[in-house]
Amino acid sequence: MSQDRQLQLVTSVMISAGFEVSEKFTLRPRSFDLIARNNGTLVVIKVVTHIDSVSEEAAFDLDVIAAHLGGVPLIVGERAREAELERGAVYVRYGIYAISVSTMYDYFVEKIPPLVYASPGGLYVNINGDALRELRERRSMSLGDLGQVLGVSRRTISKYESGMGTTLEVAIRIEEYFNTGVVESIDIAKREPAKSDSPTSKKPQGPGVPFGFLEELGMQLHTLRGAPFQALLTFDRHTILTGYGPAQKVVKRAALISNLSRIAKKHAMCVITDYHHEKKIGRTLVIGEERLHSIEDGFELLDLLGDIGADPSPRDS
């Protein structure tokens, strides 16, 4: 399946699930392909054919963008290594959940969460350790007794009760023996996958944008490589999607940044190096770099940006 066709399917799934989806854009390389929102759930999605093709750099951008937009990052693909992604299974790439379109459909449309996660050595499940301990104690079984029944050590049983995952085979034996479920489903919409290879501890290496003076005004700057916007600015619990460059380059992206900010319910700004005024294109504040340098603090910038939910009115000064 081509990546464009896969992106169409992902978009259709999210719309079917009641999500509002951002417009398609052609920027390459890109750290994400679309943003989708449904009430309080925001998902930042990267669509690929092969999930191993997602670089650590792209994963870092995807994770940073999702975190600052108040959403969850998600990779959707077809294959991992030489095999197709299993339906109902979750994979992890650089600390980010990766699933197939079918698993996405099951979770978002059918409300059926996945139970299985892929890890070196095969497919595993999470055990509800408290439930397992309660079942064991109800039968007055020691750790060793249950270990003998399942063919594992007492230490392994102790680890299961402390939250360690296990193989499908062992999980089935546990549920058959106690005649009840102990396997926990995986909530894709939570930001807490097992981050053994998480990129979040690494320093971002985005392109340079000369916004050091904004940091001096108390704003935080996060530069990005593969997004329609070059940076995310944060100030006083506000996030600003920020583009930067000459007018010919940036104005083309202003409408897209506006669309993304509307879905994410965040501010949008384009800083233009060869422009000396300010105006609004959609929801995006287009402002000259020289004009931006004249602001006195972050609150003045927020005043220029206006309310997130307000209808933009043309302004040029």
Curated annotation (Swiss-Prot):
Presence of keyword Transmembrane helix: no
Annotated GO MF terms: DNA binding; DNA-binding transcription factor activity
Pfam entry (one): HTH_3
Record-linked PROSITE patterns: HTH_CROC1 (PS50943)
Transmembrane regions: none
Keyword Transit peptide: no
Portion annotated as DNA-binding: 143-162
UniProt-recorded name of the protein: Putative HTH-type transcriptional regulatory protein Mboo_0195
